[in-house]
């Protein structure tokens, strides 16, 4: 069916050259840079198509079969697919796929299971936790009496004895397990035992490792936690968004009410469509192979960096991310982040446990392998990337403001590498 109305027929290029130009520049950046930000990934063309669909037009307040608007028959179909697939992916009894983000998912759980002023125990941001787990600037740090556990100074591993001691002393309503920058596996059974000992609910935020869990390469928190939250991007390789899982029917009802109408109005149906596609992709054997490569690539990258004289927090990784301590090289995180970006490698400065530097400077960087693995990099390519990173490090030691010649040479090598593994 043709339509002469230019509102419906004009492309973005015809309608808005400025926005199209910015998008094309971002596409070129993604095509030509190696993405090592651990929380980022690259979605499939199918996910892009779903997220750019006519579902963006549809308001669908409520839940499938119980909407506050008409015309939701096919919105219901899409959301039901997303719910069924994510439940199957994580062997969960109940799922809410409407949270717009991981932060919204976490907020919904806290709204459902705790009252303002209640004590909440989460991992310290300084030790690798997330802002939404009770950091003072976040809503969770303002609404609740938020206490923080950390890691052992000797091992840099979560100090479960400290978690237990804080729980016994303060009797939190909610204990949060999860992280933003922690490279080791979590002991969900230990967390649940601690929660049960003080009558607390256990929430696991699996945002970073959801894909690893979906592939069966990490224990499934749904088997231990009262409630599990996650993002849909990162290792799960979907659109930017969130979801909540539980096996408890009463908690599920509270979560649904907390998401809508508690925190959100209408769901983003085009994003939920993208989530459904990504969940379907994650149910395949190809996805398990992908996650195995993500993990192997993290080991390969870490081995090269350690051999080159930098420290890895905890000595290595069990997952997709590496927390790099730059102090042996005499470098700072902000300095390295900027130099690597000039060289065609994107990462983020990141504090390390007990970091003496300010959060805007840091003594470390966080690296991740999901995006590079999605575009096809294997261990050989990640070893090459590690070698190039070390060259930038060494140049910075001589020229702390940046070595233009080294950065441009590395940039050319990175560009050539990316050309071998094109995206879109």
From Swiss-Prot:
InterPro entries, per the entry: PyrdxlP-dep_Trfase (IPR015424), PyrdxlP-dep_Trfase_major (IPR015421), PyrdxlP-dep_Trfase_small (IPR015422), Ser_HO-MeTrfase (IPR001085), Ser_HO-MeTrfase-like (IPR049943), Ser_HO-MeTrfase_PLP_BS (IPR019798), SHMT-like_dom (IPR039429)
A Pfam cross-reference name: SHMT
Entry keyword set: Amino-acid biosynthesis, Cytoplasm, One-carbon metabolism, Pyridoxal phosphate, Transferase
Compartments where found: Cytoplasm
Coiled coil: none
Transmembrane segments: none
Superkingdom as given in the UniProt entry: Bacteria
Biological pathway: One-carbon metabolism; tetrahydrofolate interconversion; Amino-acid biosynthesis; glycine biosynthesis; glycine from L-serine: step 1/1
Record EC number: 2.1.2.1
PROSITE patterns, per the entry: SHMT
Cofactor: pyridoxal 5'-phosphate
Binding partners and assembly: Homodimer.
Record-given protein name: Serine hydroxymethyltransferase 2
Gene name tied to this protein: glyA2
